[in-house]
């Protein structure tokens, strides 16, 4: 692809890796184009940059293209890179001729007159410098750690440090002398020093005098208030001994220069070994102080190792030359009225330059030490503020309006920083946005684009066409026609957009279906038209939502959009593999109305000879839509269908007019659907067998047959239609690949059209089965019609010649056939949508107040409740029950009463199915029973303010999350003032919960994406034999099945042969894909657990293999290599997060384990692996054995002392005691056998504790079960494999305890795969392997431990990541997706992961390639986008004026960024 030199001097596709290291002073000088010596920016009169200042044109490049900054001579583009020689000064300065864009990449530097410590290296991550140096503070015991304030005092010249002790015991090396204890230390040092000299000598007297002065000053008020003069004492000590005391950056420089890293490493390793040995000796229990010390030593060792391995000098952490970033990255903008607005960074640079210059003057004048010291401190502060002003709390440098200046670090971090604002989400050209409105007449793959918008989006193509068709003569002319919206252009625009696609995106982009491709259709008005069925995946509605439009430009982008992103191909949702495109609301209402059966309706029992005749009778109002009539079977379905096959001659099929109309939209080969039993059938064949009674031979009395034999069937509701759509999808979704169809079309010149069906029948489907006869017939018909169309267009029939088809014509036929074949499901869905809208209008459903039917039994129920509550109060007053009991019973009673009222209303609903409101509820179009109960029955109990609940849980009190006085009125009766007030709290809570939830859920998705972003399907089979045993996920508390076994094994591969329980026969071999049928067979055979291949046991590094992942739920086929399953997993878990409740409590009742926490807070708790879950954690058993006794120790405190009979390693039986302090129910009783890690009491398990006691498999199963439970309770189905991916990432790190002979060091956190590789190498060389333990890391920490520092830095804690990457000189090999987006490469997934599998969904080629000779095929380099730049260049040349940059471009990520104010 041609890249303009102006923008991309470095081709991003050629970047192989990115390394980060510490910049040495020489590096900074080599980057620099000159030294900045003056703090001036521009001249206030001439507005020209000052020479030697922060905007100097000689250093940073010219303000105007190709103009010499000294003499002002303007050159041509061709002179770029040469030197100006117009004047002597130009020759002397060697001024290069450059474009003004060079001001964005030319750097300068400031030569500092004294080194400065880089702020990040002593502030970030508890200070790298001090981890390296290991300092002590005077006047404190050695064990006490050095506090950050001590270090800052040293760097900011407030305290001093001993650099060399010179043999003086009072001054040990590396001792920090704080001003408060300085007098004592210096006194001791001088007293020690004086003993070295004979009394009476001059030196002795000198020291004596200094000592007396010190004692006098230290005891005076001034000395006590302000401390003593360090400098004078330092001079004396340094004069009379070898000691050396320093302060500030120079002292740090001295220490770093003289540091022996190798020796330090050995010392630290020895200390760690000592603690580890102690731990082994004492039997795995060591004091917490030792453990903390070891943690500190681990961290120190990590830093020392980083410097040793990267071979960098520690002094590089000091700044000698300060780089000045390019001028255009910190611009000075002229405002109206001659004022200027400047970037904060300029202000910070100016402070540094002013102070640096002043220091130079002081040094030249030989000023007093104190003055120079003060200036040095100010420079240090100025450079700190420039690097990271926000961290300089509590006193960052403030601007005039009292806000902290934005420093260089602030430009990197946070949502508005470089990473997230400019690198991961950019504003893009060729995009726009507008409000959406419904487009009911669109096909599913279309969307309506406003004419004016299309004119702007497709401008270059339109201009090209206008000139080609000679409508306009020049580009300028064409552009003017577009701007004036000349009516001539509209037909041309319509032609231009033919065959092009647009991408529509609705923020927040929660999953991949939030961006889909559509064919644009021009519409009038200013709103985008959206197909009603794609609202579900976009989560859009038409109450003012906006959507963004993007135009794919290159040929390749168009191909991908058409094959992978077109809306009609995205029928299934990714999270559960069920159709996400389901009709709703009016469409459901229409179909429900259409399929109602009414006994005795007008025209019942009539027999029609064909379908058209029936429709005419209905239109003439001779027969009702709901009347049951008969039609000949051939009119309705292919009589070849098994269920209808019979010897008898003429047979009729009985159903209502509406159901005939409904069934007419399906292909003739689809079974006739009579009733809603279709949802109970496991397959269409099974359903078809049950419908024989609706088929009668000729001559039967139809009216009698209907009355006697046929029950009145229910109409189709939302669930039935969803199931029917699933059947349609399974039956008609494309079973062949584009390559297969192309192969048949390639033979069109050799095979007669009538025989083409045989060629299709010979093909194999993608899962290696024979092609279904029906698909072959459909494809043959489509091929025939497309071929005839193409031949007719080329006018062959006129000459009567039989000319063979050429490659272009074959490609045209292929495009037509393939589109119509893959569009079959969508076209049926479109027909369902049209029917739904049509008949919901015809049904004329409306409702009035009289339609809300009430129950007359309600007052007696209310009275019963009131009497019961009064009695409870009496009992409580008499002291018979506690307040907690009274509350719980009250809540229970009112809940029961509401249930009774609901029961009465349900009866009413049954009796009045044709009531409009009840029709809406029954059909599933809108509303549900609980809405109706509030409308006509009673509103019931309301949620309480739950501020105090947490305390209640901790104190084991009953949680009062519900107001105990219910709202007794319904909306139809109207609420009293108190009831209205009471209900406002609950209502508002609902609204605030939703808002909070959206933000939290967005943040969760972002974290999960970061956890799993580099997981891509990379191999066919990793060969792992480590399976995962699955069985029903059962809630151990109430025995409910949360996820049945069948659902867990469909679409997975078996890891071991599966043997039936009943027949004992082998049902499936190892590595067999478990299909729906096979799964049903396994369940029928009574198999209770199956070992499957799982992501958790996959051996693929940075990814998974096809076998361990199984079926791709979105396509219902085995996953393809290149699928970015990590991101799909994150989206599938995050997207439904919004629907999880924020409620921590279920309604009322005693706080059991179930009530403590569910929903969103619990999910976060599991995914972040919290150490302190909400409420009181469960006690888990540390032993395996039998419980022999349970002593309740104290009556007041519920504490159990369990005794467990354990068989130890020596085969002896011993009794172990376990304390269970809790009021929660015990999970076990005497005589139970308990396993290690089993819960002894109710409550959430602390995951880290479980991992310590058991193994990884137990923890993985626990997490999987708990996460599934949260979603399933809310009725959200998510596939296991997605949760497995996240769990695998959480448990992918190992902490090294004993490094053996490996390259790791103790305390390092390494990736499991690196650990295994290293150990395999060591064992093969007969060396000692490393030993470590798996650790569990929450989703917050996993991305920070990523191998890629770019991915980690763009997530959180940017400065910390970059500091560690720099000291260890890390390289980023750009293996994940995020890193590649940052550097602007294609992501290594999908179509960019070469070579992709042939016949996979990513094997996308232009149609013409299937019919060309291989050498003529389109190569990758030919996928060049339209050269849009040449248009822009011509325009620029014509207009010769500055085109203002318009900020109305849309960024894909912008929208969601604003949607979720993220929490970091």
UniProtKB/Swiss-Prot annotation:
InterPro entries: DNA-dir_RpoC_beta_prime (IPR045867), DNA-dir_RpoC_beta_prime_bact (IPR012754), RNA_pol_asu (IPR000722), RNA_pol_N (IPR006592), RNA_pol_Rpb1_1 (IPR007080), RNA_pol_Rpb1_3 (IPR007066), RNA_pol_Rpb1_3_sf (IPR042102), RNA_pol_Rpb1_4 (IPR007083)
Necessary cofactors: Mg(2+); Zn(2+)
Region of interest: Disordered: 1435-1464
EC number of the protein: 2.7.7.6
Any GO CC annotation of this UniProt entry: DNA-directed RNA polymerase complex
Domain of life of the organism encoding this protein: Bacteria
Annotated binding of Mg(2+), by residue: 541, 543, 545
SMART domains: RPOLA_N
Catalytic activity field: RNA(n) + a ribonucleoside 5'-triphosphate = RNA(n+1) + diphosphate
GO biological process, one term: DNA-templated transcription
Alphabetized UniProt keyword annotations: DNA-directed RNA polymerase, Magnesium, Metal-binding, Nucleotidyltransferase, Transcription, Transferase, Zinc
Free-text comment on the cofactor: Binds 1 Mg(2+) ion per subunit. Binds 1 Zn(2+) ion per subunit; 2 are expected compared to other organisms.
Molecular function GO terms recorded: DNA binding; DNA-directed RNA polymerase activity; magnesium ion binding; zinc ion binding
PANTHER family cross-referenced by the UniProt entry: DNA-DIRECTED RNA POLYMERASE, DNA-DIRECTED RNA POLYMERASE SUBUNIT BETA
Subunit structure: The RNAP catalytic core consists of 2 alpha, 1 beta, 1 beta' and 1 omega subunit. When a sigma factor is associated with the core the holoenzyme is formed, which can initiate transcription.
Protein name in UniProt: DNA-directed RNA polymerase subunit beta'
Taxonomic placement: Bacteria, Bacillati, Mycoplasmatota, Mycoplasmoidales, Metamycoplasmataceae
Gene name in the database record: rpoC
